[in-house]
């Protein structure tokens, strides 16, 4: 799965949860706090991604996510382990 596909899914999740986020290829490297994504928002996004893709994030890795690029990379890694 490509970066833009995962980012699109994150955008869909954010929109469905009424998060007011401006997510695109330009903002993917901005710190989460600059995007106004707090820990509860991130938890909600992560749970939705886990359900959508049938993956499970490691809690320690989640604690180290600094931006959406980190999240997308982790999704890609988990999907690769799953053979997707």
UniProtKB/Swiss-Prot annotation:
O-(pantetheine 4'-phosphoryl)serine modification, residue list: 39
Position of the signal peptide: none
Tagged with keyword Protein transport: no
Metabolic or biological pathway: Lipid metabolism; fatty acid biosynthesis
GO cellular component terms given for this protein: cytosol; membrane
Biological process according to GO: lipid A biosynthetic process
Keyword entries, A-Z: Fatty acid biosynthesis, Fatty acid metabolism, Lipid biosynthesis, Lipid metabolism, Phosphopantetheine, Phosphoprotein
Post-translational modification: 4'-phosphopantetheine is transferred from CoA to a specific serine of the apo-ACP-like protein.
Domain Carrier, residue spans: 4-79
Protein name: Acyl carrier protein homolog
Organism field: Mycoplasma genitalium (strain ATCC 33530 / DSM 19775 / NCTC 10195 / G37) (Mycoplasmoides genitalium)
């Amino acid at each position: 799965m490509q970066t833009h596909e995962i980012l699109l899914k994150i955008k869909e999740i954010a929109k469905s949860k009424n998060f007011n986020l401006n997510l695109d290829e330009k903002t993917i490297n901005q710190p989460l706090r600059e995007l106004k994504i707090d820990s509860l928002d991130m938890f909600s996004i992560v749970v939705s991604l886990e359900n959508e893709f049938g993956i499970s994030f490691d809690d320690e890795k989640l604690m180290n996510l600094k931006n959406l690029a980190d999240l997308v990379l982790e999704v890609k890694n988990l999907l690769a382990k799953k053979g997707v």
